[in-house]
From Swiss-Prot:
It is found in: Cytoplasm. One of its GO terms (molecular function) is heme binding. GO terms for cellular component: extracellular region; hemoglobin complex. The lineage of its organism: Eukaryota, Metazoa, Spiralia, Lophotrochozoa, Mollusca. This is Hemoglobin-1.
Length: 143
């Protein structure tokens, strides 16, 4: 992964801040994603049992989804210097999402929202965009 040391440090430190607040931040991230991309929210209709978008933020299903996503991003951040682990994680992630009919474009949209969202936690949007690009480089071939 061709990230500078400063980019990696920023991603790690900003993720530590966001992760510590993820009980609140996680649902906020997903609501930002859903508000920006109705097509992504539609992919969660089974999880939320067809509930309206405005009603899902404080549900147990949202809490579980947010924690699952936190674990995924934490694994990616923890392995920024371990290309083999990242590649394996990305292959599994791609297979799981492809099986649910989620497109590479929808994943890219989620990464874009995440990059902007992380600014609230001291994240550099360019660093997060670089990480997203590197991850998508491993995800896209498996979609």
């Amino acid at each position: 992964m061709s990230l500078s040391a400063a980019q990696k440090d920023n991603v790690k430190s900003s993720w530590a801040k966001a992760s510590a607040a993820w009980g609140t931040a996680g649902p906020e991230f997903f609501m930002a994603l859903f508000d920006a991309h109705d097509d992504v929210f539609a992919k969660f209709s089974g999880l939320f049992k067809g509930a309206a978008k405005g009603t899902v933020k404080n549900t147990p299903e949202m809490a579980a989804q947010a924690q699952s996503f936190k674990g995924l991003v934490s694994n990616w951040v923890d392995n920024l210097d371990n290309a083999g682990a990242l590649e394996g994680q990305c292959k599994t992630f791609a297979a799981n999402h492809k099986a649910r009919g989620i497109s590479a474009g929808q994943l890219e949209a989620a990464f874009k929202v995440l990059a902007g969202f992380m600014k609230s936690y001291g994240g550099d949007e360019g660093a997060w965009t670089a990480v997203a690009g590197a991850l998508m480089g491993m995800i896209r071939p498996n979609m």
